[in-house]
Each structure stands twice: as structure tokens, then as C-alpha cells.
Amino acid sequence: MKVSRSFSPRRMMPVLLACWSLIAMPLQAQESTPSPQPQPQAQPQPQTMIPAPPRLAATSWILMDAGSGRILAQHNPDERLPPASLTKLMTAYLVERELNQGNISLDDQVPISEKAWRTGGSKMFIEVGDRVPVSELLHGIIIVSGNDASVAMAEYLAGGVEPFADIMNQHAARLGMENTNFVNPTGLPHDNHYSSARDLALLSRHIINDYPKHYATYSEKQFTYGGIEQPNRNRLLWRDSTADGLKTGWTEAAGYCLVSSAKRQDMRLIAVVMGTASSEARVQESQKLLSYGFRYFETLKLYDKGAVLNTSRVWEGDKDELKVGVEENVFMTVPRNRNEELTAKLDIRKGLTAPISAGETVGSMEVRLGDEVVGKRDLLALEEVQEGGFFKRMIDKVSRFFSDLWSGWFG
């Protein structure tokens, strides 16, 4: 007959102490290595005094850094306004998305319906029954603001204007455009068709960053189709050699609107002005915003995608340490000559235990400029840590028990 003995902590203590003696030394290592502080490339300079942002003759405006997403100036940024042909930024974005995913190609021949041909307002001048390449229609949408081209692509991608508008709204929600609702792909007036300066800046940032190989189209100054040459309506392209996008808009209700972007050195800004009095005014007001941003701010690259920002202790895995970093390059926009005030604080989840997948969120990073929080990012596992073998897991369990006990006793 087998006799079982009851568990006794006193009997187990020598075993546990023996295990502890084997693993105590490794436990003296830190839970994680200190995080590297931001090392901006800019050299220290005397601090620049930052004036208040310019006041514009417009209903709403916003100035955003395309790299960091930081807002540098704004006025009524969330007011719901008619966007006019700024709507076509979403139309073009969805075409670019379909191209990027391989669902369509630039050479696809799009049949032109009578509905597309009859659409009023600005035109590319396509004809009923023509078959026009996607590449030509995309140019027609972006450069000459063709309503006919916009409807043709809506029909090609979604089967009609209404289902395409539904897709537009789904993507607006996905991108965080909280004050936007689209009814058509053109921007022709409708009471329930609206957007905001903030939402349009956010959309433009995605156009620039998500599909960069298509972005050069926004800087082209003219477009010819069917023997008809038309200029790009964005006159800022002629005024500022650093400007390279994006889109104009006008209706009587919307006024004269412009979403523009310019890049100087490594800094790219996006300016949105809505509700100005003339085509000249929208250019001048946009220039004021861009000049303010480039004069008084700078965008610094703090960390590279995939750079190891922290090495953290992992329990019960096939390795004892986990490399931690960020998913994308980290940019921060700060007032000029204050880069030395940047600090980063990493908060790694305590008690990381295998298995851990590459790309799994394991903590967060907070970037401060002095006492101001200027950015937050998720911290991800840069590698996979698989579950360790039986004895490795048992040793780590004992090790962790004593580590927690030691921390509880001695803080």
C-alpha cells in the first residue's frame, strides 16, 4: 500500500533555499535596462520666443505637422463646414488605397456613364462611352478637380455614388474623422455633407504618409486630357517652391478653401483654411500659417523604427530578456531650440511572462518637453519569446516567488 505524505513547508524549505542559491545572483540584475533618452540631431541654440499664432481671415483653420501629428495653430478646428471639392481628398485616398492593395491597377479601363458625364461643376471633360485609365481619372480628380472623374471612379469602385459615399464614411470613421459625413464623392452641396479643418488635416496626413508613391500627383501644375489643358487650381504651387499639395475647394456655401502642404528640410506641415473670401485670400492665409510653423517650430526624429529602447526581464521563456521598441519612427514637433528639454519615460508591464509575440504591446512611452506631455507611443515586443521548457519554467516560478518576496520585504 502506498503511503502519501502531506506537504510540509518545513520539508520543502531546504529545496527552495537550494534553488534560490542557484538563481539569486541573476536576480540581482535589473528588471529592465534604462531607456535611452531622446537624442535630437539639432544643436543647442538660444531659446526662440514663440508669438501667438496668426489670426486669419477665414472661418476655420488648422496647422499640423505631418510627421508627428502635433497641432501648431488652430481656430474652430472642429466646426462642421461644407468642404466643397476638398471632399475629393477622400475620393483620391480611396483610389490610392485600392491601388496599393492591388484591387485595381492604373491601367484599368473605366467605362464612363452618362451620369458621370452629366455631373455639373468642374470637369475633366470625359465623354459618355469612353473607357478611361484609372491613372488619367486620378489625375483628373486631384489636379483639375473633375466631378465627372470622381463619379466615374465611384461607380467603378463601388457601383454607384451612394454606396461609394458609404465607403467614404466608413474610412472617415476608421481614420478618426469625428466631424465628417460624406454624401457624394465630389463635394457638390448637400445639407448633410460636411467636414472640419481637423478632419481634413488628418486625412491629408494619411494621404501623405500612407501612399507616398502617389503623392507627387498633387504637385503637378497642369493636366491635359482630350486636348484640353487645365491648370492645377492650387496657386500656392506657383508661390512657394516648397509647397507640393494638396487640394482646393469652392462653393458659395463653403467659400474658398485650401488644404496645402509644404516641406522644408526634414519638416513637413499641413495647413487647412476654410471659408476665405477669394482664391487669392486662401493662398495668402495658407502662407501665413505655413510661415509661422516653419519659423518657430522644428520636427525632430527621436527614435528609429525597430530601435531597441529597453531590454526587459521575461519569466518562463526560452530567453530571459525581451527587446522593446516602437512600431514606427518617432517624431516630435517642438518650439525651436528647446530640444534639450525633451525627456522620455518608459512604462513596461511588470512581470512579463512568456509566451510573448513579436509586435505585442508590452508598455507605453511618454515624451515630455519640460513639464508638458508632447507625445505618447505604445511600446512593442521587437522579438518573439517562446515558452521555456519544464525545468526553466519551474526555476523561474521559484525565482519569481523569492523576487516578489524580497521586493515585498525590502521594497
Where would I find each of the regions flagged by the language model?
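Hydrophobic alpha-helical segments, especially transmembrane helices
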Residues: 11-12, 89, 264
